[in-house]
Amino acid sequence: MDVRFPIGKLQVPEKVTIEDIHEWLKQIETYTNRLGETVNSLNDEELSKTYREGSWDIRQLVHHIADSQLNMYQRLKLALTDESPTVPAFDQEKWAIQPDTNLPVETSIKMLEGINERIVSLGYRLTEEQLDQSFVHQINGEISVASKVAKLAWHEEHHLAHIKIALSNNSGS
């Protein structure tokens, strides 16, 4: 297994259906509870564990998940409200070292709870036509609403797997 992609790379079907969207939304809907069950009782030493040498530690991963969902949610909303808006990339490495990432992981879990609730509420009301609406990412190009919902689900699961790998490692890194 490649620990960088423990659940594999994101794969989006060529033709995404409303059923696909609903499956991804079910994952997003339960994610905050599953993440909380995994990290809420961890001490500082455990939160400092990494899944591979040079990777973010568990604390940074939890904050990154919230930061990313926030950015992706905003992009999703822009794709639904504007005509092919261009969105900037965000420098996740710089976000990961900002002072707010020293807060307890519970702050990001609370943030995720609200963002994911909004994503799920919006997602269950998407129409077939809306799945093809898109935004233009300044680096990655055109991204459809359907692909963004897939990534919203995949990205969280991807990092939950990283956290579980870090916890199974015996060393601090």
UniProtKB/Swiss-Prot annotation:
Cofactor: Zn(2+)
Compartments it resides in: Cytoplasm
Cofactor note: Binds 1 zinc ion per subunit.
Pfam families per UniProt: DinB_2
Main location: cytoplasm
Keywords from the UniProt entry: Cytoplasm, Hydrolase, Metal-binding, Zinc
GO annotations of cellular component type: cytoplasm
InterPro entries with a match to the protein in the record: DinB-like, DinB/YfiT-like, Put_metal_dep_hydrolase_YfiT
GO molecular function term, any single one: hydrolase activity
NCBIfam families: PRK13291.1 (NF009807)
Physiological role: Possible metal-dependent hydrolase.
Known partners and oligomeric status: Homodimer.
Protein name per the record: Putative metal-dependent hydrolase OB0413
Protein's organism: Oceanobacillus iheyensis (strain DSM 14371 / CIP 107618 / JCM 11309 / KCTC 3954 / HTE831)
Lineage: Bacteria, Bacillati, Bacillota, Bacilli, Bacillales
